[in-house]
């Protein structure tokens, strides 16, 4: 017998659209969800940035372990940039959800004038 292989894709956020399940999409819930994740990203960026500055300060005050603190500073700086990127991504997801909500509820047609 041949073994059946099942491929499972694991994602950090198991984000499913209601449309994929056959139900209507709650756009207000989508907007709130992305807004919440955007705020989490912003907070992560601020926290990681503060920790990077703290490690920079520790590197100056503790010359014996300065190299360790500089490495930790750089790690936190990268984390801050990553969190900022995540917040930026969620901001655009939120904008898209708002746009879809407006199109579905209002039935507005966009006319482009060039």
Curated annotation (Swiss-Prot):
Residues 7-16 have a biased composition (Basic residues). Pfam families: ABA_WDS. Residues 97-107 have a biased composition (Basic and acidic residues). InterPro entries: ABA_WDS. Residues 1-25, 88-114 are annotated as: Disordered. Belongs to the abscisic acid and water stress-induced protein family. This is Abscisic stress-ripening protein 2. It comes from Solanum lycopersicum. The gene is ASR2.
């Amino acid at each position: 017998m041949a073994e059946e292989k099942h491929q499972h894709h694991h994602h950090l956020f198991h984000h499913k659209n209601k449309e994929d399940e056959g139900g209507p999409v709650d756009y207000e819930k989508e907007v709130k969800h992305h807004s919440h994740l955007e705020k989490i990203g912003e907070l992560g960026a601020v926290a990681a940035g503060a920790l990077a500055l703290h490690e920079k300060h520790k590197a100056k005050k503790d010359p014996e372990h300065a190299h360790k603190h500089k490495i930790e500073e750089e790690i936190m700086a990268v984390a801050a940039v990553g969190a900022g990127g995540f917040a930026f991504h969620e901001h655009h997801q939120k904008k898209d959800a708002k746009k879809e909500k407006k199109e579905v509820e209002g039935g507005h047609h966009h006319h482009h004038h060039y």
